[in-house]
Amino acid sequence: MSNLQTRIITAIVLGTITLWLTWVGGVGFTLFSIAIGLAMFYEWTELSATRQTAFSRLFGWAWLIVTGILLILDRGALLTIGFLVAGCAILLVTQWKSGRGWPAAGLFYAGFSALSLSLLRGDEPFGFTTIVFLFAVVWSTDITAYFNGRALGGPKLAPRFSPNKTWSGAIGGAAAAVAGGLLVASLVAAPGGWGVPVLALLLSIVSQIGDLAESWVKRQFGAKDSGRLLPGHGGVLDRVDGLVAAAALLYLFGAIFAEPDVLSAIFFSF
């Protein structure tokens, strides 16, 4: 079986599980989001092992688990974010000499990713649509950028970070993201206006930046993949880097234009 076939099969299986848990929502999706965050933190600490200490690992795991418990107990977004930021601050101060900002960055990256995904879904009727909108934008970006880049080639997007990504792939991915976002948004709101396409474009751009940033992190530690958990895709970070970056932006957008704990109203503020 070729790497592309393995990649496609893994994507189909993961996509099916993800969409089912998104439909279920509630605690099920929250646990799924926390599992993603925990996997991200594991891979981050393994990648940056030379910047970690026994304390940073133990403290990071404990703080991330408690953050997840706060999410499950639904203690409020601001409290959970505040708790997460406090933990990152402690790591930054206590581990700066040995690890610089790597331990704190890993905790925030994993924790805020889990929090963003969980709160975007929430328990509201349109939480499902909100997450599907995010998936449509990011997956359209990933799939189209991959195949468009391979078919058209052309100038490299950021060869210092990721030698295989091209401008043709990035532009094609962004265009597909706008189309995918418009399709999903049309299910819950009347067509028209500039809000949805602009948001979809921004999410696509941030998704691709998140992908490049994760590639940069791997290069800092001489790694090709973040892990081996996902056949054909490498690690969890390799698969969700763009998704969690876009989720963070969409969460912030919803928190500003709706409210931190109930984000589905984002579709009615354009």
Swiss-Prot record:
Statement: the UniProt record of this protein carries the keyword Nucleotidyltransferase: yes
Gene Ontology MF terms in the entry: phosphatidate cytidylyltransferase activity
Any one GO BP annotation for this protein: CDP-diacylglycerol biosynthetic process
Pathway assigned in UniProt: Phospholipid metabolism; CDP-diacylglycerol biosynthesis; CDP-diacylglycerol from sn-glycerol 3-phosphate: step 3/3
Keyword Phosphoprotein assigned: no
Keyword annotations of the record: Cell inner membrane, Cell membrane, Lipid biosynthesis, Lipid metabolism, Membrane, Nucleotidyltransferase, Phospholipid biosynthesis, Phospholipid metabolism, Transferase, Transmembrane, Transmembrane helix
A Pfam family assignment: CTP_transf_1
Annotated compartments: Cell inner membrane
Membrane-related topology note: Multi-pass membrane protein
Annotated Gene Ontology cellular component terms: plasma membrane
Segments crossing the lipid bilayer: 19-39, 53-73, 76-96, 101-121, 126-146, 183-203, 248-268
Assigned EC number: 2.7.7.41
The reaction(s) this protein catalyses: a 1,2-diacyl-sn-glycero-3-phosphate + CTP + H(+) = a CDP-1,2-diacyl-sn-glycerol + diphosphate
Family designation: Belongs to the CDS family.
PANTHER family linked: PHOSPHATIDATE CYTIDYLYLTRANSFERASE
Protein name: Phosphatidate cytidylyltransferase
Organism the protein comes from: Brucella abortus (strain 2308)
